[in-house]
């Protein structure tokens, strides 16, 4: 932890500004034009990164929360300066080329956080976000900049299904709490409630305490913290996309997290919360029991309890104050005891086999029992468009494994979600009759017999590139296997004759992204 806090009580300018600007008078003269007072000269400057815009419905209330954050900062002796950041809405990209841009924007957001913080010498940061890519994006930036920081998630929308379930947005807000970078109960409090506004106010006050004590993200985002977050993720059955986002945040924090870590921790972490889309329960119901702190209290025997959090206390100290309201459970599967879980292992499963030598992911907590083992002929599509066209016309058969390739992080490029294909199968009543497999990914709002993130992807020469319609694919979720029933020699023969397809995009951001991005199960980030 840093010893030179730069707070007003030190009687000197904030440390970042003083170290970077011998001519601080010039800098402060510009801040005076922003409306600061002369008495603010010795106060820490806190950057308030707000991903508000009029496009993303989950971000509409962030302006109000930012005002609460700045009020908290000011009441604790600091100055909060708000700035904007790009933030996409995944829904606008569904089943069209716009989805190629959604995941890459996560890294653009992380870069924006870094660029603004370093260019303007903030003493600390509060980062407000609500949605799928902006949440991990600002967390990546927070980890990279490594100044006293707090993440404020937007919370859940009352009676709004996309918000009350463990889609990617809410999964990442829950995992921010599990990592220790968000105040307890922020994720599961209703977005526009007085309680959520109060949590935003507290975040503004607490970031000043972090500045005073010199507590930075690297004190919090340790390997032990990431292992805690993975266990919470398995216990709640979070989004597929957490396999991409947690390793990316870890990379920016200087910690290596792999798909094998998810696999190892899933084996010893029970699935405790049957929350949508996997099950009938909702996040607001989990909040009645105690939210993510209650989940972590149940998991306490499996967690690293001495990790630091943004409360300024360890996880152990935080959990000592948590009471689980078991009698308030509206449904027994909202949260189950450790010795009586929904299932004995985690709600996400890493599959491997000759079809996915480096791995693939299924949300096992949302798979029907009769689909845990499945074998059928492949029906191969070389793009999402081809698959969507066929599925919309019901041009497939029960018992098939529908396989979509060339939609990976390089091939897409940008790894667009294949969610509309999955949702169409669900509406057609086929979730107990077919499997969908892809080197692309899915929305966190998806569940069922959907396998994604097949790695290596097709355009990088993974075996998925040479599967032919009619080849038999065997899936065994219990044994964590996915295989095409072909001799190794035949797979190698096909691969030796295979040539990668021409890039779909040759200029602009996506072209640069495809050339530089690391594989999805390593985090899909720009190094």
Residue ranges and their predicted role:
Residues 2-58, 65-86, 91, 97-102, ...:
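Catalytic or ion-coupling anion/metal-binding cores of large enzyme and transporter domains
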Residues 108-120:
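Short, well-structured alpha-helical segments in soluble
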Residues 117-138, 150-154:
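A short, small-residue-rich loop immediately preceding and capping a beta-strand
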């Amino acid at each position: 932890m840093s010893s030179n806090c730069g707070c007003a009580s030190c009687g000197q300018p904030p440390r970042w500004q003083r170290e970077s600007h011998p001519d601080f008078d010039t800098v402060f003269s510009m801040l005076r034009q922003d409306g600061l007072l002369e008495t603010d000269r010795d106060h820490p400057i806190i950057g308030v990164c707000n991903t508000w815009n009029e496009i993303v419905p989950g971000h509409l209330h962030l302006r109000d929360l930012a005002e609460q954050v700045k009020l908290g900062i000011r009441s604790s002796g600091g100055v909060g300066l708000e700035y904007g950041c790009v933030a996409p809405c995944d829904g606008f990209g569904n089943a069209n080329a716009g989805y190629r841009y959604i995941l890459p924007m996560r890294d653009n957001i992380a870069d924006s956080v870094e660029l603004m913080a370093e260019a303007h010498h903030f003493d600390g940061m509060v980062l407000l976000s609500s949605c799928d890519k902006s949440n991990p994006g600002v967390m990546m930036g927070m980890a990279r900049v490594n100044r006293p920081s707090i993440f404020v998630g937007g919370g859940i929308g009352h009676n709004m299904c996309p918000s009350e379930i463990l889609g990617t947005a809410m999964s990442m807000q829950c995992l921010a709490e599990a990592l220790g970078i968000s105040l307890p109960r922020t994720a599961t409090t209703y977005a526009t409630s007085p309680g959520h506004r109060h949590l935003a106010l507290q975040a503004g006050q607490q970031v000043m305490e972090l500045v005073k004590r010199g507590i930075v993200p690297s004190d919090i985002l340790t390997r032990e913290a990431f292992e805690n977050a993975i266990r919470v993720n398995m216990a709640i059955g979070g989004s597929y996309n957490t396999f991409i986002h947690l390793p990316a945040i870890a990379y920016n924090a200087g910690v290596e997290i792999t798909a094998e870590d998810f696999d190892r921790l899933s084996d010893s972490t029970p699935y405790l919360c049957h929350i949508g889309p996997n099950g009938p329960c909702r996040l607001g119901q989990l909040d009645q029991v105690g939210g993510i702190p209650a989940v972590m209290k149940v998991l306490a025997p499996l967690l690293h309890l001495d990790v630091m959090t943004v409360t300024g206390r360890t996880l152990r100290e935080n959990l000592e104050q948590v009471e689980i309201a078991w009698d308030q459970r509206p449904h027994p599967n909202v949260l189950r005891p450790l010795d009586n879980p929904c299932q004995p292992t985690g709600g996400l499963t890493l599959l491997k086999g000759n079809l996915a030598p480096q791995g693939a992911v299924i949300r096992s907590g949302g798979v029907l029992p009769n689909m845990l083992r499945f074998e059928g002929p492949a029906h191969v599509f070389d793009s999402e468009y081809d698959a969507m066209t066929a599925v919309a016309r019901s041009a497939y058969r029960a018992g098939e494994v529908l396989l979509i390739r060339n939609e990976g992080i390089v091939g897409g490029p940008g790894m667009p979600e294949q969610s509309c294909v999955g949702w169409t199968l669900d509406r057609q009543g086929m979730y107990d009759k077919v499997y969908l497999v892809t080197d692309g990914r899915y929305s966190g709002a998806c569940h069922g017999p959907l396998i994604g993130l097949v790695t290596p992807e097709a355009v990088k020469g993974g075996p998925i590139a040479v599967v032919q319609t009619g080849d038999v694919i065997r899936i065994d979720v219990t044994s964590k296997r996915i295989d095409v029933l072909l001799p190794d020699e035949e797979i190698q023969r096909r691969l030796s004759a295979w040539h990668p397809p021409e890039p779909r995009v040759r200029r602009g951001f996506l072209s640069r992204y495809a050339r530089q991005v690391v594989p999805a199960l390593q985090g899909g980030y720009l190094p």
